[in-house]
Amino acid sequence: MSSTDEKKFEGVVSEEPVLTASSSSDNGRAELGVSTNGEQPTVDPVFEKATLRKVDYWLVGFYSIVYIFRVIDSANYSNAAIINLEAGTGIKAELNLNASQWAWTLSIFSYSYLIFEPSNTLLLKIFRPSRWMFVLIFFWGAAACSSAAAQNFSGMMGARFAIGAAEAGFYPAVLYHMAFWYKPQELPNRIALFYSVGQLSSALSGLLAYAVSFMDGLQGISGWRWLFIIEGLPAIVLAFIALFWLPDYPETAYFLNDKERAFLASRLDKRAPASWGKSWDLEALKKLFSDPTFYTFSVYWIGHGIGGFGIGYALPTVIYQLGFTSTTNSQLMNIPPYVATFLFLNTLGYLLQRNIIRPWTTAVGIAVTIIICYIILFTVSNSVVKYIFLIVAVSCAGSAYPVIWPERMRALEGSVSSGVGIGFTNAMAQFSGIAGPRIYSTVFGPSYHVSYGICLIFLVVDIIALLLSWFFVHRKDKRVAALLEQ
């Protein structure tokens, strides 16, 4: 290979991971669970599986528990719209909110996400994951509890903005943190599990709202205020668990022995984020912003966020306006869509991990399915049929991002590019929180024909951006393969 080719090759192809602290020593390899049969080292699968299982418990397991309460916190604000509505003690009545003001209290949350989300991944690298996660989790728990004290529109706007600012960094920071521990091909089922637990907690939020509705008036406190207090307290407890027990990086993980730490630290691609990597690199950012996938993935995240995911911000109200349930039972009817999402997403994660299906074709299929659901919702009038296809649409919408995230992360290189790229990409999804409450405003109910029509347009944009991203990533893969052959 020429020196010119070598320079091109560096930045698009990773070197073989160094599997041992002493690569020249077969004994050293054996100690790290690596054998040398011929030229290519092979990893002991039993040792690797056991080591990764430990990481799964401490990293994926903990983050999944935290994500349950993070999603409950977000989802329950939509549930609060109809809690104790008939009793006259609902949140809109007590805070004197009109339709426009209610939409603003929903969307201000996403504005703070857009502002604070892109930088949070880098802050995690600067301050260490355990410390930064403590800050995020503690402050969103405290802000959630504080929102129960809101007395008017401006008070709730301030509380919601503070919650969004604290929660903004959590999801992209989790993905970024995982990239320090796992190979890209190991991420699909782990991201699917983590994300689907959050979707299941959206179902639990409906159950929690249903139960809390019976606390209305207890100690002179309205049901919706109890809801915000109860959902915020667990986050404060989990924040201290993160501070003292969340592992930062493979090299410093207290629950691993020396052999396991060395193995995990040496197995990743050189382009993957690393604990010793820079926290800021202007050249890496220039390369990131010149990559066409930075823009095509961003458009996809916006298109799917508004077209597919936006309905989630108004789902309790949409279900209530189907006309065959009371507000109390409507909380329970929010559960099936998210249970379906949990089952569907974990099934997809299982199939993706075993290469039975491919992420790109699966993501396109999801978008097409949502389009079909919206067309049916647009044309039929039967409430039961509408509810069934709402379940299908919500389960598909909630599964799209986790399916394509590993491909998005694979297209990023290095600690800085990965951090900024993950944060910025996920921030684009917050347009759903800005546009969703307005697209699904009650002024378009109960049919929501205008809402479904607008979302159809965004889903078409979603598919185009997805196909372009697929093209650019595939082109890069071909370039890598060609250089490998030289």
PLM regions: where:
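Glycine-rich segments within core transmembrane alpha-helices of 12-TM secondary carriers
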Residues: 188-221, 228-235, 422-436
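Conserved MFS/SLC helix-loop-helix module at the cytosolic interface between two early adjacent transmembrane helices
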Residues: 114-154
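Helix-breaking motifs and short loop linkers at transmembrane-helix boundaries and internal kinks
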Residues: 73, 95-96, 127-128, 149-155, ...
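Extracytoplasmic gate region of multi-pass secondary transporters
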Residues: 78, 283-349, 401, 405, ...
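Intracellular terminal tails of multi-pass secondary transporters
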Residues: 1-79, 83, 99, 243-278, ...
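Extracellular/periplasmic helix-loop-helix junction of adjacent transmembrane segments
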Residues: 78-114
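Helix-to-loop junctions at the C-terminal end of transmembrane segments
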Residues: 115-128, 343-358
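Structural signature of the two symmetry-related core transmembrane helices
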Residues: 131-145, 360-375
